[in-house]
Every structure is written in structure tokens, then in C-alpha cells.
Regions:
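Conserved N-terminal beta1-alpha1 strand-loop-helix module at the mouth
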Residues: 1-175, 197-204, 215-221
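Short amphipathic alpha-helix with an adjacent loop that forms part of the alpha/beta core around
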Residues: 191-195
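Glycine/Thr-rich beta-alpha phosphate-binding loop at enzyme active sites
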Residues: 171-186, 203-236
Length: 236
């Protein structure tokens, strides 16, 4: 397939989906990552189209691979069919032996809270899921806050997740742990197995297709997707 044919496939994807991703102002187009000359034409077309739609390089690559697999699975390229089949993203059902302890399918209101006092207030008010996001470099303060948060939810039925501080969470017996992508990359060898074998639930933050696929490979209890809307809490 020549460059003109690839450009035709790219244009077909853009025509079918540009409105879908326009939003209020639309996302700015991203540079198309370089590819090998022998790359699959559908992959090349989808990579360029997804970059034009505003997907960053890793997400455009993940989508392009999914589009290539989708076309192979269906036996034809369909520009109107946005990839959504798990197998096209290389995903499969987790092996129960490697999965983390499960959470309810519906976690309800998920209120990210700055300290143990807020955790207690929201748990007593009936908020079902209360993640503690306590930011500090002081190990003593971290352990004190985590232990206080665990005590604060006793008898309320609230599910307490500890953000980032996984060792303190294990020590205090928290319901679950939540980590971001950077924390996932920084975990020491054996940390995931320690969390898994303890029966503690694990949640992982994601912000796009590539990170969701990466998180899925860990078989966590749940995967969080955000920020859907702009946030002032951290730089995204």
C-alpha cells in the first residue's frame, strides 16, 4: 500500500471521528511518531489519525495497534469502527491466581481526602469509599495519619484506600491501596506480591489507553481513569 492509500485511510478515520473528539475546543493535534518503513499500513494510518485527534504518542500507538488487530480480526478495515474490543488491545481475562482481592463493582462516591480527620467525617456521613491522599515526606506523620484513618472508618462500613503509602497501609491493615503510574514504576521488587498476598485491594490511576493497558497487566482490584475534567490538585 502506497503513501496515498495510507493517507486515504487516515482521512477516513478523521472524517468518521473528528466530531466525537472535538469537545469544547478540541485537543491540539500531536506530532505523529516515527514508524518503520515496513510498518502495517493500517497501523500507520491510525497512528497519524489518532495523533491528529490529539492523542499523545503512547496512546496513539496503543490505538493504532488496536486498529490493526481489529482489522485483522474482522478481515477488513472499517474507519467508522473505533477500537473497543479487549482482545484488540491485547487484554485478556486475568488469571485468578495473579489477581488482587476484588472490590465491589460499584464503589459509589469516591471522595479523595487530605487527612484522617476528613476521612472520619466523610465515613460517618455515609461516603462509601474514602481514599486518603496525605502528602508528606515525614514517615512518622505518614504512619500516624494512616493509622488514624484506619481507626476513623471502624464501624462505618466505609472502604479506606491509602494513596501511595503502601507499606504504612499494609502495616495498619487498610482496606486498600491506591497508586499512580509513577509509584507503580517505582515499586521495589516483590512489593506487588506483598500487597497481593496480604489480601489488600489495589487501585491504579490511569489517564489514557496506554496506561490502562499497563495497569490491566497487573490485574488490580480496580482501575481509575482521570482527570476527565481539569484539576487544580496536581499538574497533569
Amino acid at each position: 500500500m502506497n503513501d496515498a492509500s495510507i493517507a486515504t485511510l487516515q482521512a477516513a478515520i478523521l472524517a468518521a471521528h473528528r466530531t466525537r473528539f472535538a469537545g469544547q475546543d478540541g485537543l491540539p493535534a500531536q506530532p505523529t511518531p516515527a514508524t518503520d518503513d515496513g510498518a502495517d499500513p493500517i497501523y500507520q494510518a491510525a497512528l497519524s489519525a489518532c495523533s491528529q485527534l490529539g492523542f499523545i504518542a503512547c496512546d496513539a500507538h496503543t490505538l493504532a495497534l488496536a486498529w490493526q488487530r481489529q482489522s485483522q480480526r474482522l478481515g477488513a478495515f472499517d474507519a467508522s469502527l473505533w477500537p473497543s474490543h479487549a482482545a484488540d488491545f491485547g487484554l485478556s481475562a486475568p488469571d485468578p491466581a495473579h489477581a488482587f482481592a476484588p472490590c465491589p463493582q460499584q464503589l459509589g462516591l469516591y471522595a479523595v481526602l487530605p487527612d484522617a480527620d476528613w476521612v472520619g467525617r466523610m465515613a460517618r456521613a455515609g461516603v462509601p469509599t474514602v481514599p486518603l491522599r496525605f502528602k508528606s515526606d515525614d514517615p512518622t506523620a505518614i504512619h500516624a495519619q494512616v493509622q488514624a484513618a484506619v481507626a476513623a472508618v471502624q464501624g462505618t462500613g466505609a472502604r479506606l484506600f491509602i494513596n501511595d503509602h503502601w507499606e504504612a497501609a499494609l502495616h495498619a491493615g487498610a482496606y486498600g491501596i491506591h497508586i499512580g503510574q509513577e509509584d507503580l514504576d517505582a515499586l521495589p521488587a516483590g512489593a506487588l506480591q506483598r500487597i497481593r498476598s496480604s489480601g489488600t485491594r489495589l487501585g491504579i490511576s490511569t489517564h489514557g489507553y496506554a496506561e490502562m493497558c499497563k495497569a490491566h497487566a497487573v490485574h488490580p482490584s480496580y482501575i481509575a481513569l482521570g482527570a476527565v475534567f481539569p484539576t487544580t490538585l496536581k499538574k497533569m
